[in-house]
Amino acid sequence: MQELIKRTLPQDDALNQAIVNELRSQNWAGFLNYSQVQQLCHNFELTPLKLAMHLLPLAASYSHTAISHFNVGAIAIGEQGDFYFGANQEFANSAIQQTIHAEQSAISHAWLRNERRISDMVVNYTPCGHCRQFMNELHGAEKISIHLPHSQNNPLHSYLPDAFGPKDLDIAAHLLAEENHDLVADHQDDLVNQAILAANQSHCPYSNSPHGIAILFKNGDVVTGRYAENAAFNPSLPALQTALNFAYLNDKKLSDIERIVMAEKALKLSHKTMAETLLSTLTSVELEYYSL
């Protein structure tokens, strides 16, 4: 990742050098907190939006696009000014529905870092309909601004007029809000407990079938993922995808996976088979499944 980032950001530029130094200090995690953003903006006389635009090729470098070879980068800006990178993640030898879009990537990245509200989405290509619908699930969706290289300060709902969303199904819950499904993490295995805790934070008001993923890497690091459901159903994002996406954006190698645990309360639907199918194309490590 280090060399890819350096190729993306030519190191004969002082701003690029400063960005690389920030990323190096955090092991190449695709994230800049508010303080880092403000320092870069101050040092190089930039607005946060101009900095985000400059960072789009960098965000896109986190993509995995074995199918399309079309890299999309996105940056979700949290309400306190943190920058969450996102990139499209494709999975060869699996169903195309397993794909993670760049805006989904950035939002789920923010969610797993416990962001509660997105104010702006900066992306290098116009959001597709799938992503517009996914963003409409967010708390405060009507206030989100979309920024493209050729057009800034566009309300999300200008891309999604007469929008269908949670309110049409009498659902008050929104993605990124605090969730609690009363799932108890009392297993003897800590990795199972982490999967249960992730499931407990799922956003699944339509099926009430939460599930979570916990991935243990060989160095002892653990990455978790939560299920993000959508009013339109198909733009929903399973927990395995949110976990894999977070791993990619934090420079984790799937070859270093040691264990993968899934905890699920399958009331109306289950993601077990879908997760096993995708994992079989990525790793020889088998899914450990726990029914809640």
Curated annotation (Swiss-Prot):
Catalyzed reactions: cytidine + H2O + H(+) = uridine + NH4(+); 2'-deoxycytidine + H2O + H(+) = 2'-deoxyuridine + NH4(+)
E.C. number(s) listed in UniProt: 3.5.4.5
Active site: E103
Top-level taxon in the UniProt lineage: Bacteria
Name of a matching Pfam family: dCMP_cyt_deam_1
Keywords tagged on the record: Hydrolase, Metal-binding, Zinc
InterPro entries hit by this protein: APOBEC/CMP_deaminase_Zn-bd (IPR016192), CMP_dCMP_dom (IPR002125), Cyd/dCyd_deaminase_Zn-bd (IPR013171), Cyt/Deoxycyt_deaminase (IPR050202), Cyt_deam_dimer (IPR006263), Cytidine_deaminase-like (IPR016193), Cytidine_deaminase_bacteria (IPR020797)
Cofactor binding mode and count: Binds 1 zinc ion.
Cofactor(s) recorded in Swiss-Prot or TrEMBL: Zn(2+)
CMP/dCMP-type deaminase domain span: 47-167, 186-292
Residues bound to substrate: N88, Q89, E90
Residues given in the record as Zn(2+) binding sites: H101, C128, C131
Tagged with keyword Hydrolase: yes
Molecular function GO terms recorded: cytidine deaminase activity; identical protein binding; zinc ion binding
Annotated GO CC locations: cytosol
EC supergroup of this enzyme: hydrolase
Subunit structure: Homodimer.
NCBIfam families linked to this entry: cyt_deam_dimer (TIGR01355), PRK09027.1 (NF006537)
Protein task: This enzyme scavenges exogenous and endogenous cytidine and 2'-deoxycytidine for UMP synthesis.
UniProt family annotation: Belongs to the cytidine and deoxycytidylate deaminase family.
Name under which the protein is recorded: Cytidine deaminase
Organism: Haemophilus influenzae (strain 86-028NP)
